[in-house]
Amino acid sequence: MNQPAADMYYSQHMSAGQAPPPQTVTSGAMSYHSQHPPLQPTHMPQYAPQPQYSQYGYANGLTSPQSAQPASQMGQNVLPLPGVATQGFQGFDTTGQVAPPGMKPRVTATLWEDEGSLCFQVEARGICVARREDNHMINGTKLLNVAGMTRGRRDGILKSEKVRHVVKIGPMHLKGVWIPFERALDFANKEKITELLYPLFVHNIGALLYHPTNQTRTNQVMAAAERRKQEQNQMRGAPQTGAPGLPSIQQHHHHMSLPGPQQSLPSHAQMGRPSLDRAHTFPTPPTSASSVMGGNMNASDSGFQWAQGQGMGSAQGANPMSIDTGLSNARSMPATPASTPPGTTIQNMQSYQSGAQQYDNSRPMYNPSAQQSPYQATNPASQDRPVYGQPDPYAKNDMGPPTTRPATSGAPQDQKPANGIIHADQSGGQPAGDEEAEHDHDAEYTHDSGAYDASRASYNYSAPAVGNLPAEHQHLSPEMTGSPSHPPASGRATPRTAAAPQPYYSQQAGYNTPPRVPQQPSSNLYNVMSNDRGTAAGAGTGDVYQPQADMGSMSNGYASQMNGAGGIKRGRDEDDDLQRPSSGGGMDLKRRKTLLDSQVPAMAYAPPVMAQQPRRR
């Protein structure tokens, strides 16, 4: 390993599958400590009578080709019994080299990206003890944990180590105090856990990975590790190369891992890894599988294919895609081969936020200010954020609420519907007409819109009234629908893009809660079904007044009354409620307590006397 001599010696032993005898340790010591080798000849004869250990040759764990020659060279006497070895060498137990009877070497290897080294891992007693490939240091903390040592004693021992490397960040099994190989072997021998940890101390532990029956898998692992190293170096060298950088890396992976012509996706699928890593970006739209990996990963290419995959005109597709590859570089994903390629997944991810494209709501995310430009690599967080629908810092800042609406931009107390009605984004029960009118005003701001602020109307409802919504793919990003350039499909502008209030806001400038469309019967019925007011006293829900939100839809500001049965009690209600006709919340709370006891269908005629009352007060 470190010295060619040691390499030669150990590789022979390893491959022979014989537990290297005590002298292996000495020779190991030779390689590390440069001790004298004379022990080898002296001890060899002692162990001659135990040839049966060659049965345990464990050639399975080691490179088979060499297995024949070392045995012949060294003779059978190289095979010590573990017990004898312990007696022969106090402090230098070679059981680390010898497989205990019946035990198969179980080694896994992972790439420790922070340190740039491959780590071999052996698990014992549920604890994973790691050893680095480059300098063979071993995680002493985990090693002593396997020994069952108390924390205080363990830390004391490790603090007194002269050569140690403390790791405080990273995966759990890699944190701890790393100590040199020889010291770790010492500790393991003292604590009698060397056999338990086999093959952690086998000098040529890498050979155990190259298991003959497992050769292809092992090669894949090692090749992947190599690829990652190279990739990391590339990415560090040119962190934000933009679109051109992607193809090179992408093709680099294809060529390294696969023989034969590298087509866009098929080869990618065979690689096996990208599918995994792509999953941890975000669900890509259904067609992304065939189109995300454009042939050469050119920005326009992949965009073009993606757009066609979505059934959109190529004219729209080719243009906006320039964003994608830049974006994927900009976001802070680990630069593993598979997480880089879905360059378009980022744009797919953004496309999620614009479900009902015709409202153009996600357009300002790209237009308004320099920091939001998706090309900018400095704020990957805010580029990823719209994807997940979290409240977007700039989405809120840039959209001024329409002038007629009270300043609700950040005020959930306004959003909370006056009567506690569950909105369509919560229950989905409201009729379509209601949804549109109501959500165009307040769904962006509703009290539960923490998850929706960034994506706004796109998630909150799918307005059935819009003609081309069914035809268009729900997940298209605003650029792809061309929303910046052509008028919104629905024919109306969003609050953020319109200078003047929308026509349907202007009539109701006086209301503090979002007005409703005149869809009274269904609205009333909805209250009956899902409002928490009606059930307090088994009361009917045909309230004297609709919640303030509903009043906008009625000509005179109150709902039609129920049939005369409730007349007297309702009169009292009005006296209480109407003192503050503008505060919807107060009305509802009182009304909830004092509703009628009879469940009656809504929509009866309103006595004229009642009708005058709101105006008197």
Swiss-Prot record:
InterPro entries: EFG1/Phd1/StuA (IPR029790), HTH_APSES_sf (IPR036887), KilA/APSES_HTH (IPR018004), Tscrpt_reg_HTH_APSES-type (IPR003163). Disruption phenotype: Impairs conidiation and ability of their appressoria to form a penetration peg, leading to unability to infect unwounded Granny Smith apples or onion. Residues 45-58, 305-318, 334-345, 488-509, 599-617 have a biased composition (Low complexity). It is found in: Nucleus. Residues 569-593 are annotated as: Nuclear localization domain. This is Cell pattern formation-associated protein STUA. Residues 24-34, 61-76, 346-361, 368-382, 519-533, 553-563 have a biased composition (Polar residues). Residues 438-447 have a biased composition (Basic and acidic residues). Signal peptide: none annotated. GO terms for biological process: conidium formation; positive regulation of transcription by RNA polymerase II; sporulation resulting in formation of a cellular spore. One of its GO terms (cellular component) is nucleus. Residues 140-161 bind DNA. Gene3D superfamilies: Transcription regulator HTH, APSES-type DNA-binding domain (3.10.260.10). Residues 1-79, 223-274, 300-451, 463-617 are annotated as: Disordered. Transcription factor that regulates asexual reproduction. Binds the StuA-response elements (StRE) with the consensus sequence 5'-(A/T)CGCG(T/A)N(A/C)-3' at the promoters of target genes. Required for the formation of aerial hyphae, efficient conidiation, and the formation of perithecia. Essential for the generation of normal turgor pressure within the appressorium. Required for infection of intact apple fruit and penetration of onion epidermal cells. One of its GO terms (molecular function) is sequence-specific DNA binding. Belongs to the EFG1/PHD1/stuA family. Keywords: Conidiation, DNA-binding, Nucleus, Sporulation, Transcription, Transcription regulation. It comes from Colletotrichum gloeosporioides.
